[in-house]
Structures are given as structure tokens and as C-alpha cells.
Amino acid sequence: MVREEVAGSTQTLQWKCVESRVDSKRLYYGRFILSPLRKGQADTVGIALRRALLGEIEGACITRAKFGSVPHEYSTIAGIEESVQEILLNLKEIVLRSNLYGVRDASICVKGPRYITAQDIILPPSVEIVDTAQPIANLTEPIDFCIDLQIKRDRGYQTELRKNYQDGSYPIDAVSMPVRNVNYSIFSCGNGNEKHEILFLEIWTNGSLTPKEALYEASRNLIDLFLPFLHAEEEGASFEENKNRFTPPLFTFQKRLTNLKKNKKGIPLNCIFIDQLELTSRTYNCLKRANIHTLLDLLSKTEEDLLRIDSFRMEDRKHIWDTLEKHLPIDLLKNKLSF
């Protein structure tokens, strides 16, 4: 973090991308500014965004590889220049772009002699390879070479215990971190009581998403994290009355709707996020993949729209309907929902 003094003017808080470039297929760069901020706010925002960008962004990667008749990962295979361990390390470096959740299968099946690159991976739908030229192995003899792969979307760095699996599969330490690096710097502007700060944020990604997309996802994650604190359970309740009382999940979808109906106010559907609906993780992930983030997004969809979502089932549709029917006013359902 760098702090400098510059001349500047005050204005409405806004952000802007001031630089964007593609250094290579696996290295994107973006530079953003947020201003004007009061003294101390730039540090608060910078630290939170940096942590969210490095630790909360999800990515897809290869997590397991299965070879035929290989006793251990340090083995060598006749006709292949690399050892099994080197092939696993090369597979670990493959950068994938995908919005799918859960485990997906992929494979490689080629005949030598030839070089094997990421382009040779047979992928499931909706999964793309960022750099098809990434090397995997070199077949030096006319042999058949086949690997079964598993792809998983996750976040952070996941390590697995090294052990020999009877089926010939080996785990690959998953690096689900699309953001490679984040820096931020703070510049002070103005004089005296009119002093403000400008936050500069630099983001480098691996090409599976752009810095702007990463910034959006990190911001969304922070909003979801702090959302419960925006709604008090009982306004005006004293600390003495509540200090020894524990109330489990206060900010559920049901309670928000109850309070809204009690106050006889219109329901702000765009302010109720789907993670408050207490859906199953499967249903929630299906909706998120379809960019359905709020109750307004959900109620804007028809049954046909939902059933077109990848992996969305009739059971998911029924679960959503039961939840909404139980907690939403029936007239709102009739007006908004076309199930």
C-alpha cells in the first residue's frame, strides 16, 4: 500500500477503470479508482477488497487425474518423456473458465508420437480452456495415452493427502484462485478540512475472468457478508434487554417479509437476495449460475426460463414454489410468478 499527496477536487463518490490490458492469455491487468473518500475510508475499502479478491473469488480447475496401471505418482510411463508427477503438475497449471458447480468429468485420449497440450482435453459443455497451448506431456513413441480428469469449481487453495488410490487416480492440489495479485494505493487530495482520499486498486487475473469481473464478484461477496447487519431485529431495544439473549438467524427471508407486511410497506424485491430464501445449496447454485441474485430476478423468470438452467430439475422448481408460497403474499405470487 502506497500513500501520496496530490491536488484534487471533491465530487460524488464514483469508481472508474483507468487502465485495462491483456499481457498474455493467462495474465490480465486492470487499474481502478474510487473517489472521493473521507480520511481512513480508503484503507478500509482497500483492505476489504484485497482480501475478498484474493480469497473469495471462485475458479474452476482440475482436481484429479486417473491413469491406467500406474503404481504411484513418481512412476514413468514407457513412451512418455515426463513422469506421472510432472504430468500432474502440468495439469495443475491448466486455467479453465466455467460457471458450473459440482464435479465435472473430462478426459484426454490421444495416440503418439506427439505433444499433448491443453487443447487435447475433451471438456464438458460450458467449460473453456483459457490457454490451449499449455503443455501437458510429450509422447515419444506410438502409444495410446488416456487420462480421466475431474474438474471442480471452488475457492482458495485446496490440498489433498497423497495416497495411492486403487483405481489409479491421483489428487491434484487445487488452486482455485483466478486473481493472481492485488495492490492498492491511497492518494490524499485537498487541503485542511476539505481533505479527501483517492483509492487506486490494481488487479491481476489468470485470464479466466477479467479484473472488472473479479472486482464485481468480490464486491458482491462483501455485500452478502454485511447484509445481515443492515436490518435490526427490534428497533429501539436496549442493550440490557438483549445482551444475554441469543437469537439464531435473525435476518432470514421469512422475518424480513413478516416485518415488511407488518409495516404495510411494499416489498423491495430487489433488496432481498436469494441466499435469504433458505434454499438448498443445489437450488441456490443453479440460480446463481443463471445470474439470479435477488427475489426480483427470480420472480421475473417464467417456469420455462428456470427449466432451461443447466442442471435445474423439477424438484428445484417445486422447492422454490413451496418456499415462496409459504412466505409471500398470495396476491404478489399471482401477479409476479408465472409457474
Swiss-Prot record:
EC numbers for this chain: 2.7.7.6
EC top class named in words: transferase
Biological-process GO terms, alphabetical: DNA-templated transcription
Single GO cellular component term: mitochondrion
GO MF entries: DNA binding; DNA-directed RNA polymerase activity; protein dimerization activity
Keyword annotations of the record: Chloroplast, DNA-directed RNA polymerase, Nucleotidyltransferase, Plastid, Transcription, Transferase
UniProt-annotated location(s): Plastid, Chloroplast
Pfam families associated with the record: RNA_pol_A_bac, RNA_pol_A_CTD, RNA_pol_L
Recorded catalytic activity of this chain's protein: RNA(n) + a ribonucleoside 5'-triphosphate = RNA(n+1) + diphosphate
SUPFAM superfamilies assigned: C-terminal domain of RNA polymerase alpha subunit (SSF47789), Insert subdomain of RNA polymerase alpha subunit (SSF56553), RBP11-like subunits of RNA polymerase (SSF55257)
Region Alpha C-terminal domain (alpha-CTD): start-end pairs: 264-339
Residues covered by region (Alpha N-terminal domain (alpha-NTD)): 1-233
The family this protein is said to belong to: Belongs to the RNA polymerase alpha chain family.
Function description: DNA-dependent RNA polymerase catalyzes the transcription of DNA into RNA using the four ribonucleoside triphosphates as substrates.
Description of how the protein assembles with itself and partners: In plastids the minimal PEP RNA polymerase catalytic core is composed of four subunits: alpha, beta, beta', and beta''. When a (nuclear-encoded) sigma factor is associated with the core the holoenzyme is formed, which can initiate transcription.
Domain comment quoted from the record: The N-terminal domain is essential for RNAP assembly and basal transcription, whereas the C-terminal domain is involved in interaction with transcriptional regulators and with upstream promoter elements.
HAMAP family: RNApol_bact_RpoA
Protein name, per record: DNA-directed RNA polymerase subunit alpha
